[in-house]
Amino acid sequence: MTAKIGIIGGSGLYKMEALTDVEEVRLTTPFGDPSDAFICGKIGGVPVVFLARHGRHHHLLPTEIPFRANIYGFKSLGVEYLLSASAVGSLQEAVKPLDIVVPDQFIDRTRNRISTFFGDGIVAHIGFADPVCPALAGVLADAIADLNLPDVTLHRQGTYVCMEGPAFSTLAESNLYRSWGGTVIGMTNLPEAKLAREAEIAYATLALVTDYDCWHPEHDSVTVEMIMGNLQRNVKNAQAIICETVKRVHAHPPVSKAHRALKNAILTPLDQVPAATKEKLHLLLAKYL
């Protein structure tokens, strides 16, 4: 089964309740095994592919997530649009726990993750000034707004700071990220978004705010208990938002520059790429060979 729309579920979102005609697909990729089986099915009759980012039993640390295998797996299943649901902490007073942010920017503070499919004889530099697809993010934000969910405040843009984890921020770090203009902080959307761009998949994030990190003087520092309590309240909303977004993307697929991200990004002449590397990356390079 193939699908043009993929969904990555973060902490708390380990399955899609609305999925029908469910089929589990286990893949092995040139970059190892993905986080779990891909769950193929339909939402409102629309084919989709779902993956639990940390595994369905949440057994993977953020650093341990096989980001390249996950994105490669989505690509091999035909995915062109990828919706990422992620738990985040807020770095701004105006962005409250239980709010929803659709980020338009990222700051990468990870340090132990491979962030590219390339190397081994091929060099590519993707454009990443706009790290999410504005068209897909717009569809997502419009779906949230039109659902008019109770007690949900939508923030149509913001900067997601991606830290390495698994420990939460120190107070000094949290205040530093605030001074940079960070809106929310999480541990998983990078290198995920970079790899999606290299795979020419349009990517957008549904960021579910669970806490105020540790900077807020009137709120307790973040704990797992706090996160999970608020996240469970957000998961029901996330399910509804994703279902509505899937319907809209299927009805009117947004035009995305991400779908041609490699067109002018590859510097190495393709006839000079080692055969083994070309074979490994054939899924990404096929239309340029």
Curated annotation (Swiss-Prot):
It catalyses: S-methyl-5'-thioadenosine + phosphate = 5-(methylsulfanyl)-alpha-D-ribose 1-phosphate + adenine. The record marks S169, V224 as: Important for substrate specificity. GO terms for biological process: L-methionine salvage from methylthioadenosine; purine ribonucleoside salvage. One of its GO terms (molecular function) is S-methyl-5-thioadenosine phosphorylase activity. GO terms for cellular component: cytosol. The keyword Glycosyltransferase applies. Its EC number is 2.4.2.28. The keyword Nucleotide-binding does not apply. Substrate binds at M187, D211, Y212, D213. It is an enzyme of class 2 (transferase). Keywords: Glycosyltransferase, Purine salvage, Transferase. It comes from the Bacteria. InterPro entries: MTAP (IPR010044), Nucleoside_phosphorylase_d (IPR000845), Nucleoside_phosphorylase_sf (IPR035994). Phosphate binds at S11, R53, H54, S86, A87, T188. Pfam families: PNP_UDP_1. Pathway: Amino-acid biosynthesis; L-methionine biosynthesis via salvage pathway; S-methyl-5-thio-alpha-D-ribose 1-phosphate from S-methyl-5'-thioadenosine (phosphorylase route): step 1/1. HAMAP family: MTAP (MF_01963). Homohexamer. Dimer of a homotrimer. Belongs to the PNP/MTAP phosphorylase family. MTAP subfamily. Catalyzes the reversible phosphorylation of S-methyl-5'-thioadenosine (MTA) to adenine and 5-methylthioribose-1-phosphate. Involved in the breakdown of MTA, a major by-product of polyamine biosynthesis. Responsible for the first step in the methionine salvage pathway after MTA has been generated from S-adenosylmethionine. Has broad substrate specificity with 6-aminopurine nucleosides as preferred substrates. This is S-methyl-5'-thioadenosine phosphorylase. It comes from Thermosynechococcus vestitus (strain NIES-2133 / IAM M-273 / BP-1).
